[in-house]
Amino acid sequence: MAISAATIDPSRVGGNLESAHAILAGLDPAHEIGFALAMNKLMTVHLNDQNSIRYDQDKAFGVENLRQAFNQVKVLKENGYGEHGEYVGLDVKAMRTTKDEDSYKHLENSLKIFKALEAKVDKFDYDFQQKCVEERDFEALEMYVMNLLMGVE
């Protein structure tokens, strides 16, 4: 995406970030989303999850790494993604041995997790984050996020 500025028409260049593909490349999906958003090049995003650098698993969003999923939802919400017609795709597939009648549960689960994480982002205390940054108390910030995700007061 960065090299798109050197093309004849940079406005025609954009990307579709898929969480699992970023993970497969050893990257953090939230950082990749943030980079694309900063360049105004995120055309769509496909959220899913991945257990390390195996084959492309297309697991339900957030089932392997809840914190990583939270960070993705947070960066999308902070940047108003979706307010101008953009959409979030759920690029997931049913597990190989899933019964036909359960073949949509992975989509339902992904959507439930996404909405639950949106609610967590809405509760995020940015003033506390700023205080932690100013005091360089990143352990407190890390624990705050974990407590938020776990529902611990």
Regions found by a protein language model. Give the residues of each.
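Histidine-acidic metal/acid-base catalytic patches
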Residues: M1-E153
